[in-house]
């Protein structure tokens, strides 16, 4: 497969603090954000004209699932198909604890299985709580950042008002890393749209050495 501008993992929290209605808002919000014209143009408008995207669901230390495998996006039709899969994804992992470190390890494995080189690799960690299970996030975060991967965060504050500080300290890392927040899942789609626009705008700056 030809190289791409961006490899992007959407990693969504499915822990017990996320109700099934909230999960539907989160998945649907991701689908809506992906369909934004600026996001669509960014994913397909880089120097190489394509991106790879995947969806990972996570909760406890032993609960991660790749819900949508790596999908090459080079046309609006490709993106629409991926957005539909994301919006309609079933909740494949149990509503358990919050194991951010284990989720990052799963993202690390997913990036290792990339079907093509990517100029930029980004993980979107989406959650509504601090890590309370499994390995601590920092070792996996540091390994990923050391490999040139950017980990960004989107914090939903309805459970923990100061979650952004925790994500800033323990989760986000890598070139250009940032975290955004939204108050609850009703504002999730707009927050994700802004986040994707910001991430994709950086995709034209290569940070991964391709062989």
Task: List the predicted regions and their residue ranges.
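Acidic, low-complexity intrinsically disordered regions
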Residues: 1-211
């Amino acid at each position: 497969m030809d190289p791409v501008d961006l490899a992007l993992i959407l990693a969504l929290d499915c822990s017990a603090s996320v109700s099934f209605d909230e999960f539907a808002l989160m998945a649907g919000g991701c689908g809506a954000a992906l369909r934004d014209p600026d996001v669509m143009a960014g994913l397909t408008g880089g120097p190489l004209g394509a991106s790879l995207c995947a969806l990972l669901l996570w909760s406890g230390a032993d609960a991660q699932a790749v819900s949508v495998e790596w999908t090459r996006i080079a046309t609006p039709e490709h993106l629409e198909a991926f957005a539909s899969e994301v919006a309609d994804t079933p909740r494949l992992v149990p509503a358990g604890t919050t194991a951010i470190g284990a989720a990052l390890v799963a993202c690390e494995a997913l990036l290792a299985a990339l079907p093509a080189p990517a100029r930029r690799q980004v993980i979107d960690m989406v959650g509504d709580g601090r890590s309370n299970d499994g390995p601590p996030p920092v070792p996996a975060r540091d390994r990923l950042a050391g490999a040139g991967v950017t980990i960004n965060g989107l914090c939903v504050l309805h459970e923990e008002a100061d979650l952004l500080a925790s994500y800033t300290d323990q989760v986000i890392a890598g070139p250009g890393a940032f975290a955004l927040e939204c108050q609850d899942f009703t504002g999730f789609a707009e927050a994700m749209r802004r986040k994707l626009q910001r991430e994709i705008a950086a995709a034209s700056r290569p940070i991964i050495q391709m062989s």
